[in-house]
């Protein structure tokens, strides 16, 4: 009876010792799994973490690698996130371990006992040894977790930054694509042979202008105002004096030049104009220096730079030299600066203050602006009135053609005024001042100072208390301003189109009666207050009124050979309708 009692105490001690031994072995095995693999020191790029936390060569030729090795991307794709975000991963089977070269003994009774005790300690309730073998989880080492998280953060930053940079530079490229570029193509426009609008040679009526310039050689040298002289003094003191030689650098990527400054031409809206000559080639040109009596702003500088790129807005003719030849547009062929000079300088002359910009347009040479020319022929004596009327007819026909070129190129000038046209010595009429040029359909806030040459829709938008005050630039906008300029050519003033005016031929020409009927009717159609009903420039050249004016101009031009010699009698020219 005493044997069972005496035998029970030692057996309890044995079982307690065995339990402590099992717990110690478990702790030792878990601690071994936290050691840093020495293989990471060699090449982390060629390694991946297996589900058990072991290191497996990615480039192993083993046939079971796809089954046993889980890359970071594959794990994320199958689980919807990094496998490190899971509590654990499944262990490989003994047969798989043996195939990968890792020696793993078959599970013995003692090992099964250890696993059973381990799961019991963790609160596991799994019942079978096979289920425990497949479902066993192991804790991933801390350094492995940190490394994988750092890789994920680096990948997110890399892809996120590259995507954001792609969107940013894509937006920059899109803005740059919309901005006009100095694409100075050398080829002729594709429709050169079929488009009758293009200029190819002298046109009827140029001899009339040459005759007037011969009779009035000082027409381009009219007395300058006090403000013009003061502005020239400011430019001479701060930037470039008459007779001075300067080396200029191109803002458009063109070769540098050495220029000699000539006489002053006059003060134009963007700045001061004067003659210049290329010292190396002897090429004559007109230079325009940016000048303003108001404090210069960044917007003023940008406006000049945009005008230097305006030729890029044309649909077909994207070369300033070709635009000068085929369209008779005086677009700048270069935008230059004088190195070593400030971009903007404040200067004072004759008690007036102005700002001189170190930005210069280089343009083909001109002789006189149209507004000055019209003022001069308005002073002709009675006996020279037929010559003056023939010149007005020429200016009318050519102004319509020039604005039709704008429409044909898909652009809107936006600021057609009498001094937007100028004449060359050979009698050609040209259009200039493309600082406000935009593509048709753009929205622009029209300045209030051009009110009498602004169509009704532009005035209404500018005076509206609601909205941005912007006007949609259409071909009808330029057509209305064209009609106003033609009115000035014949009547020496802008038409009365203020509030309360009557839209009729009789009202407009009530104080200007000596105007041909075809001109009156054409102007009436061009300044129609209705945008939809207004006659456009391309339509105007097909009207009977315009055709009749062309015939009258051809007859008048036969009277002059261009050198001042009469080539016909008065009977060769039909009388202008009045």
UniProtKB/Swiss-Prot annotation:
Biological-process GO terms, alphabetical: symbiont entry into host
Residue numbers spanned by region Disordered: 56-82, 559-578
Keywords annotated in UniProt: Membrane, Phosphoprotein, Secreted, Signal
Subcellular location: Secreted; Parasitophorous vacuole membrane
Record keyword Cytoplasm present: no
Signal peptide: 1-33
GO MF term set: ATP binding
Post-translational modifications reported in the UniProt record: Phosphorylated on multiple serine and threonine residues in parasitic extracts and infected cells but not in extracellular parasites.
Source organism superkingdom: Eukaryota
Domain Protein kinase: from-to ranges: 259-546
GO cellular component annotations of the record: membrane; rhoptry; symbiont-containing vacuole membrane
Compositional bias ranges of the Acidic residues kind: 569-578
Physiological role: Thought to play a role in parasitophorous vacuole membrane function during the infection of host organisms.
Protein name as annotated: Rhoptry protein 4
Naturally occurring in which organism (per UniProt): Toxoplasma gondii
